[in-house]
Amino acid sequence: MSSRFLRTAVARATQQRSMYENPYINRFKARSKVSEDFHKKTTGITGLFVNEHPHRALTVVYGRILRALEQIPRDAAYRKYTEAVVKQRLALVQAENDIKKLEEKIGMGQIEEVIEQAEYELETTRAIVDSKAWEPLVESAPKGQWSWPV
């Protein structure tokens, strides 16, 4: 009985893939399909797929960023400035229904790029919360470390 499982495992491990078979394309093929009536078929950027529901995606990510920022003290510079930008963009997302106009108002490229930037910002916010970057240093900085030029 165990030999049957062993044979299938060995067969899978030694199975050769043709040079024309791209696992990346097979994995993401479903994400690359866009409905016929959508205004664009591709972003023109390799690996960045068209998002047919950007308002929903941005609302979710911006909400997560704002919830993560609540864990940082109000007087921390990162929280103040990031919260201002995220709230401004969230207001734009909620106010503007047209995707092309929203891209113009945000001014950071295609809406898919804005979604990707928001996801990176969420990762950054979570990393700052984990590291507690707003707390004072464990030991004081050496004299002259922050003076420039030397």
Swiss-Prot record:
Gene: ndua-5
Complex formation: Complex I is composed of 45 different subunits.
Protein location: Mitochondrion inner membrane
A Pfam family that the UniProt record links to this protein: ETC_C1_NDUFA5
UniProt record, GO biological process: mitochondrial electron transport, NADH to ubiquinone; respiratory electron transport chain
Topology in membrane: Peripheral membrane protein
Keywords linked to the UniProt accession: Electron transport, Membrane, Mitochondrion, Mitochondrion inner membrane, Respiratory chain, Transport
Lineage: Eukaryota, Metazoa, Ecdysozoa, Nematoda, Chromadorea
Keyword Electron transport part of the UniProt annotation: yes
Family, similarity comment: Belongs to the complex I NDUFA5 subunit family.
Protein name in UniProt: Probable NADH dehydrogenase [ubiquinone] 1 alpha subcomplex subunit 5
Gene Ontology cellular component annotations, sorted alphabetically: mitochondrial inner membrane; respiratory chain complex I
Major localisation: mitochondrion
